[in-house]
Amino acid sequence: MCNTKCYNTLAKMTVITEPAMEYMYSVPLDESEYDKCGFCQDPRYRPRRHKDQHLARAGSAKAKELCEALIGVYPRPTCESAVGHSIALVMPECMPGRVEAMGEFMESIFYMDNIAESGSQQDTGNLGTEWANDMETGPTTSVNSNTGAKQVMAKLALQLLSIDPVCAGNVMKAWKEWAAGFAKPRRFDSIEQYIDYRLVDSGAIVAVHLMNFGMGLDISVEELREVSDIVNHAGKALSYQNDFFSFNYEHDMFVKLPDSIGIANAVFVLAETEGLSLAEAKERVKELAKEHEDAVLRLKDEVESKVSYKLRICLEGLVDMVVGNLVWSASCDRYSSYRREKHQMELPIRIQGPPTPPQEPVYEKATLPNGKQLDAPTESSGKDLSDGVATLSGDEPVLGDEIVSAPIKYLESLPSKGFREAIIDGMNGWLNLPARSVSIIKDVVKHIHTASLLCDDIEDSSPLRRGQPSAHIIFGVSQTVNSTSYLWTLAIDRLSELSSPKSLRIFIDEVRKMQIGQSFDLHWTAALQCPSEEEYLSMIDMKTGGLFHLLIRLMIAESPRKVDMDFSGLVSMTGRYFQIRDDLSNLTSEEYENQKGYCEDLDEGKYSLPLIHALKHTKNKVQLESLLIQRKTQGGMTLEMKRLAIQIMKEAGSLEHTRKVVLELQDAVHRELAKLEEAFGQENYVIQLALERLRIKA
């Protein structure tokens, strides 16, 4: 098989002349070692096993140690089987240097899947989205969040990023898209309806990107869509195989869970919707799987000469994955040990009849748009019909919050890095707050942050926020200001639910600092008064760092642990890093330009670090000051004015100076984090990952 460089070089080719994939890292299994149980009967489905299976087992051992330390002991078997480790069978051509990482990844996922399956179906349905957020460091607010699981997911993501950032990015993007399409478990009317659901639920698309990671194939989410039909058929074949072998276990869990509405398993769905016996349903599953197994091979033959070489290698790997998953599922301890406990062929299936069609709701009260109910009107409506003037009868409609909430919901719907939420999750790995307290603090921080963004965009006359029109452009300044005030009431309301009597004092202290910091930022801009770098850092510590100080102090106050560690260094360095990195991105990042506009800070007249440095060191100070004066007169800068300002900054070395400061702060944040990790005796993978996603390369 070609190496990674070969894949990526040949990816641009449109005419395929290379021979079929040459296996380098695996050997075919002897037929005496496995039983296909009626699946994958085409001889091209020949299972293989990685030569370095011991590396996958070493990865599993690491994962088991980590998960037991951070999550707890869970005895159910995971990756092993009588034939081999799941990674060795499902990804037989994984690059040797990545086998151990893949083993650790898969073992961890199985471990957490065990926990999910032991909970309610509602909890299970939430975990896919939460894990995606944990890998992306996006916002999570679930009160059922498992702090240890978050640390594990962050550690896995960090490991993938350290090995191959590009392929890891493909995995994370696929995971995020998968989570966005995740649906809650439900009853199904037909096997067709079920398998479409199961294709998404199984996360097959993520598995394919993990396989590509293992093989060193840089295939983006968009590129893989070129062969989406084949991937979907493979995913459905994998799902039918898994359902066949996992049914007994899943049926047992179904009986035990009080909120179960059905089993997300093809055997159950066929038995329920088509009236088949268990044996008949299992045979039907084999037939359905065969249709998709055959389709994979047929479509693969049709497209091989039309796709890039790396996609061709991916399709070969997909065939190995389908048959490897089969052999593993048929022999793994995870399912086979359970089947040995069930000697009978037929299990009593708890079937509740066909799904009940939804009925029209019956209302006994009038329902307002906000969801609140009013008693049905009586003969006396509270209105004097003689003059048409309403009286105060007490029956007036209760107005809802849909208007005041509209700007808030709009802004919160836009993409966000979720950095502050990730910091809360990471800190909780050390502070061990109750889940309820974590949820409240996240809400308080979210409300304050959203309020500050709404207000900032108005004060800065910013037309864009995260690539979309700012809220005040859509809803108007007056309405957006009112929504900002409303958010402060929501924040205080949630704050009152915290148990610590210190919470209100902490809130007042830090919010006061934030407002003072903002006042200087606004004053410098309005008065065309350039601060010193030291004054600018003090403003950042109050304005940007204030929210970080707030969340840390609230968490310490709510923590059941006695905490005497000093977080001030980490918090201050993080606030400065976050803001000055933003200063640099505003003037140099194409992504930032797409989200906020070209050099938006210059339009707003903000004294960011590059501008402050330039005004002190440029030979063209009068020219730069004149540009700022004209900006104030005109309400912004033209493209040509911005280009001139950037040129002056470059000549003064201001952009390079700012980049140097960002890199120094980046190192400082990691040093402060390392101090706390040593003090607590525990690495904080969640915060490490959050910082890694912001990293600027030296």
Swiss-Prot record:
Residues where Mg(2+) 4 binds: D456, D460
Q: Which residues of this UniProt protein bind dimethylallyl diphosphate?
A: R465, K543, T544, Q579, N586, K596, K606
Query: Where are the residues of the annotated region Terpene cyclase?
Result: 21-340
Cofactor(s) needed, names only, are: Mg(2+)
An example Gene Ontology molecular-function term: prenyltransferase activity
**What Pfam families does the database record attribute to this sequence?**
polyprenyl_synt, Terpene_syn_C_2
* UniProt cross-references to PANTHER family, sorted A to Z: GERANYLGERANYL PYROPHOSPHATE SYNTHASE, THIJ_PFPI FAMILY PROTEIN (AFU_ORTHOLOGUE AFUA_3G01210)-RELATED
**What is this protein called in UniProt?**
Macrophomene synthase
What organism is this sequence from? Answer: Macrophomina phaseolina (strain MS6) (Charcoal rot fungus)
